[in-house]
């Protein structure tokens, strides 16, 4: 794991020294002194706009001209224009720096925060850059047995020079804790589905949350049957691995209302008898991304001992083919007593959520409930990989979630709810169907309305459809290909601000 230290003294044992310059390309007195120590290397570089313009995210790695000492490279990072610099952008810049250092095989780097950036205190800026680098250091290569030496290389340590190193270290410790929660979310999402069976996944939740003071209860199929969870059980009945409902409760402040987080945990989704195409079916190991975001959020909240009351409920199932699999046309009775005609077995996530959200409301009486799910391909068609979809029955709740997402660059786009969508899930033989009676119309909105049927009056509810953002087929500033860990930082930020 990347080692991060903060100092206000001399930088020691570093191979790469990083400085930050904006588009004005002006050196303050501190940078002028540093430039002189490096024989004008900084001023010469920024004088040539073909080499460096100060544009945000631009990274220039230059061999050092100093023959003595450890420093082999000078790294100049562009800040862009200061008025456009946000906390999220500073974090992403930290990630870019780490990735450039990794490519250049620089094992130790030092970040020198010596020029004044009026939008941030030096300690805030320092902690944000370090946080971004830490997030970008994540790897999932545990099953690679033939890694080349170049692929094994990783930056070992980052030293951050700032005038208030003690406060910067305190700020970073919180960000590091949240990043480690993101790493759990990425890890469990990236795991192959033959490894993370519902039982194994449930046990990992217990192992990580109980030491943090979270009560965890694993509910098996017999108890779920007694509770009347016909929708969730129907999804998993084709699998030889037993479905689980994992219930997590964190009590941090008795005076605060309970927030419920509910996650879809489809460990692997073949589509069932409504079989998916085989070309990208392997990616369905990520179909439990909503549940992973919920667990990661619980880790982040409990790890900080925040004064809030949070419950997490995740339904862990496999949607598999077998002689016992659910059939199109089956009717299931949900825990709420409402019946559902299953017209498409590949619209299974909403069935899992129907029972999970009802259970959360029945047991914990939350004021606010947020469900998170890789629910529909339609949301990816609508929003791509830039935004997740946000549906809500409460404008204030939606606004708070969207604001939290903007602050950590996990963006949400408000999507519509309308009675006409609700009318499209009618059934001739049950209370509702699990898909629209108008093919290919408003798929993500229909799915949201299905879940809304199971939200009780008076509960502030939001549904986050993260199907387009939960995993990525390209490297980002804050992580490699694969699971993104989307939702953990968003929900942690939202929960911190909810009662303010």
UniProtKB/Swiss-Prot annotation:
Pfam families: Peptidase_M17, Peptidase_M17_N. InterPro entries: Leucine_aapep/pepB (IPR011356), Macro_dom-like (IPR043472), Peptidase_M17_C (IPR000819), Peptidase_M17_leu_NH2_pept (IPR023042), Peptidase_M17_N (IPR008283). Its cofactor is Mn(2+). The gene is pepA. It comes from Rickettsia canadensis (strain McKiel). PANTHER family: CYTOSOL AMINOPEPTIDASE, LEUCINE AMINOPEPTIDASE-RELATED. This is Probable cytosol aminopeptidase. PROSITE patterns: CYTOSOL_AP. The keyword Hydrolase applies. One of its GO terms (molecular function) is manganese ion binding. It is an enzyme of class 3 (hydrolase). It is found in: Cytoplasm. NCBIfam families: PRK00913.1-2, PRK00913.1-4, PRK00913.2-2, PRK00913.2-4. It comes from the Bacteria. Presumably involved in the processing and regular turnover of intracellular proteins. Catalyzes the removal of unsubstituted N-terminal amino acids from various peptides. Binds 2 manganese ions per subunit. The active site is at residues 276, 350. Keywords: Aminopeptidase, Cytoplasm, Hydrolase, Manganese, Metal-binding, Protease.
């Amino acid at each position: 794991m990347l080692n991060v230290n903060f100092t206000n003294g001399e930088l020691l044992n570093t191979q790469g020294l990083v400085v930050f310059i904006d588009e004005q390309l002006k050196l303050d007195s501190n940078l002028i002194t540093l430039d002189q120590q490096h024989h004008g290397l900084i001023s010469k570089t920024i004088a040539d706009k073909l080499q460096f313009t100060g544009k945000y995210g631009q990274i220039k790695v230059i061999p050092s001209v100093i023959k003595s000492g450890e420093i082999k490279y000078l790294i100049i990072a562009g800040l862009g224009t200061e008025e456009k610099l946000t906390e999220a952008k500073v974090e992403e810049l930290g990630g870019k720096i780490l990735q450039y250092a990794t490519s250049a095989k620089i094992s130790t780097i030092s970040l020198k925060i010596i020029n004044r950036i009026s939008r941030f205190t030096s300690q805030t800026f320092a902690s944000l850059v370090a946080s971004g680098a830490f997030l970008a250091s994540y790897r999932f290569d545990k099953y690679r047995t033939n890694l080349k030496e170049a692929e094994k290389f990783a930056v070992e340590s980052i030293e951050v020079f700032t005038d208030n190193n003690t406060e910067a270290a305190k700020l970073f410790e919180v960000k590091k804790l949240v990043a480690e929660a993101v790493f759990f979310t990425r890890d469990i999402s990236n795991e192959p589905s033959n490894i993370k069976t519902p039982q194994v996944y449930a046990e990992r939740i217990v192992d990580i949350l109980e030491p943090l003071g979270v009560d965890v209860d694993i509910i098996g199929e017999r108890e779920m049957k007694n509770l009347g969870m016909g929708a969730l059980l129907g999804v998993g009945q084709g699998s030889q691995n037993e479905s689980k409902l994992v219930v997590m409760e964190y009590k941090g402040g008795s005076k605060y209302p309970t927030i419920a987080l509910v996650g879809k945990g489809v460990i692997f989704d073949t589509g069932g008898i409504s079989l998916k195409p085989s070309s990208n079916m392997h990616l369905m190991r990520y179909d439990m991304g909503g549940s992973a975001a919920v667990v990661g959020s619980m880790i982040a909240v409990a790890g900080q001992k925040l004064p809030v009351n949070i419950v997490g409920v995740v339904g862990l199932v496999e949607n598999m083919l077998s002689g016992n699999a659910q059939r199109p046309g089956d009717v299931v009775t949900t825990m709420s007593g409402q019946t559902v005609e299953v017209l498409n077995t590949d619209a299974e996530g909403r069935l899992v959520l129907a029972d999970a959200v009802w259970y959360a409301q029945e047991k914990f009486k939350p004021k606010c409930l947020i469900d998170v799910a890789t629910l529909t391909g339609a949301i990816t068609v609508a929003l791509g990989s830039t935004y997740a979809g946000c549906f809500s029955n409460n404008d204030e709740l939606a606004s708070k979630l969207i604001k939290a997402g903007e602050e950590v660059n996990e963006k949400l786009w408000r999507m519509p709810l309308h009675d006409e969508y609700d009318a499209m899930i009618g059934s001739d033989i049950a209370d509702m169907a699990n898909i629209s009676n108008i093919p290919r119309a408003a798929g993500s909105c229909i799915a949201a309305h299905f879940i809304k049927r199971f939200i009780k009056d008076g509960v502030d509810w939001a549904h986050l459809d993260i199907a387009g953002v939960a995993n990525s087929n390209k490297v980002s500033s804050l992580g490699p290909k694969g699971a993104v860990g989307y939702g953990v930082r968003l929900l942690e930020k939202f929960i911190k601000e909810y009662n303010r």
